[in-house]
Amino acid sequence: MTKIVSVAEVLQGRTAIGEKVTVRGWVRTRRDSKAGLSFLAVYDGSCFDPIQAIINNDIVNYESEVLRLTTGCSVIVTGTVSKSPAEGQAVELQAETVEVVGWVEDPDTYPMAAKRHSIEYLREVAHLRPRTNIIGAVARVRHCLAQAIHRFFNEQGFYWVATPLITASDTEGAGEMFRVSTLDLENLPRDDKGAVDFSQDFFGKESFLTVSGQLNGETYACALSKVYTFGPTFRAENSNTTRHLAEFWMVEPEVAFATLADNAKLAEDMLKYVFNAVLKERMDDLKFFEKHIDKDVINRLERFVASDFAQIDYTDAIDVLLKSGKKFEFPVSWGIDLSSEHERYLAEEHFKSPVVVKNYPKDIKAFYMRLNEDGKTVAAMDVLAPGIGEIIGGSQREERLDVLDARMAEMGLNPEDYWWYRDLRKYGTVPHSGFGLGFERLIVYVTGLQNIREVIPFPRTPRNANF
């Protein structure tokens, strides 16, 4: 039985010259020479490059099948690993047999024929786009980053916690939540006041898809000390932009006894760890992005990993922006939420490095962020990266029940909706901190792609839930 190997194993020298192996994959291209040879480029997704298989015209199905192979056909090729005289690849496969597993029915209408396609077109055939160089590379980078995140937290002594995707109406920002219901829309039950009677719904109350696992994560941090969630979150924002998805993945660590300074250090360590991992493990894919998407991709990651993070208070950041002499589209004044142009000015022009902005005005931040002694600001932080702006948002959480209750009253929230969250402050409360990282935004940063819809397999956006 011949050893079955991946294309990556052969190209990375993990098989010996002269060894007989079997490779299984799909045809990227076929070239025929006048000397009675065919050259098949076969890929299996295990790495960026396909392997070249050299096929002599004396194999039994050469005329009947090999010469009919087109882009996308699936094949099993058995042959001997040999040194390649051609440039660009150290080894190739001298084929002894080529078994055709699946044909492309009509090569002329195959959506992934070997020409270049626009990114917009590829979204329309999202079920086939993983076969392209660009989306294949994204998928491998996405996997590498996800694995690195899990590895980082595991090495740091964190526990991964699965927080619920379906939550009751006790999460902030209910206006941008997707409702989960099994009620008959043609015949909705009503209460005495004519409002929809959600007590008759599946969960006996209004329920939604989660916008964050943070509050649930805090409950576990207050028992296991260091936890993180990594899963899908949902926002019903009607934003048709290159930066927004209705369904995306979030990484949310939560740490007991941690201050805002600890939180900023954790964010810096995590980002540098995962960027180092992708530089080490996926250089083949990064070189593709560097050549075709953004020539600064690799340099940007290497600079990020080597740089010290700057830190600045929000109030000082406002001063920097006011004194910059730049005319911003959104005017700068104390109390505004920083827009993307402000964030990028700070990271790219002023500090020329990643920067942590901290201690934001309480009126633009969530109720659970710890109130500072000045009574005007909260212990919040954003990590801003050159080239994209905000990449992480987090805070030290409010551990004092009386202050938490006062903040909730200020914001018109019903404390009864948060009874379980308030309990954490009643029974052995501790200072604790955490942050949220939008995973797709991280992948955009790593790949240099301009649109977040390219970095998730099946993007969910307003008016679009195909596949």
From Swiss-Prot:
- Is the keyword Metal-binding assigned to this protein? no
EC top class named in words: ligase
A single GO molecular-function term is: asparagine-tRNA ligase activity
- InterPro entries, per the entry: Aa-tRNA-synt_II, aa-tRNA-synth_II, aa-tRNA-synth_II/BPL/LPL, Asn-tRNA-ligase, Asp/Asn-tRNA-synth_IIb, NA-bd_OB-fold, NA-bd_OB_tRNA
Q: Which reaction does it catalyse?
A: tRNA(Asn) + L-asparagine + ATP = L-asparaginyl-tRNA(Asn) + AMP + diphosphate + H(+)
Q: Where in the cell is it found?
A: Cytoplasm
EC identifiers of the protein: 6.1.1.22
UniProt name for this protein: Asparagine--tRNA ligase
What organism, scientifically named, is this protein from?
A: Mannheimia succiniciproducens (strain KCTC 0769BP / MBEL55E)
Gene for this protein? asnS
